[in-house]
Amino acid sequence: MTRSFSPVVSLFLLLLQTICSATVENAADCAAVGTLISSCTEFVNYGYPDPIPGSSCCDAMTVIGTYSDSSEKRKWLCNCFMDLINVYNSNATAISTLSGFCGVVLGFTIDPNTDCNFIQ
């Protein structure tokens, strides 16, 4: 019996590879964070369904969480999230609750008022 990956799993693995191979110095890497967050589109746009651990949205947040292992990377991720909040301002609350719904600790609070320069 031959096993095959679904297109969603293949895309997730490609995104995982993209973010894991990214460098902090490259501002274009925020696009990888945005791509991962795109799996949370319905929640960000409409406020439902709530993401739950094991969903594609929470899987994406887990990948992002693995990338917050230093102060420099947390500041970088914070700035990426602030950029997303600026673009999707009307949905800032949804974006700010993603890590909590998914049980992912990023080391900072996703909030429009967060000053990323003070993240440790």
Curated annotation (Swiss-Prot):
InterPro entries attached to this UniProt entry: Bifun_inhib/LTP/seed_sf, Bifunc_inhib/LTP/seed_store, Plant_nsLTP
S-S bonds: C30-C80, C40-C57, C58-C102, C78-C116
Superkingdom of the organism of origin: Eukaryota
Gene Ontology molecular function terms on file: lipid binding
Record-linked CDD domains: nsLTP1
Keyword Transport: yes
One example of a Gene Ontology biological process annotation: lipid transport
Keywords, comma-separated and alphabetical: Disulfide bond, Lipid-binding, Signal, Transport
Signal peptide, first to last residue: 1-22
Reported function: Plant non-specific lipid-transfer proteins transfer phospholipids as well as galactolipids across membranes. May play a role in wax or cutin deposition in the cell walls of expanding epidermal cells and certain secretory tissues.
Family: Belongs to the plant LTP family.
Protein name: Putative non-specific lipid-transfer protein 14
Source organism of this protein record: Arabidopsis thaliana (Mouse-ear cress)
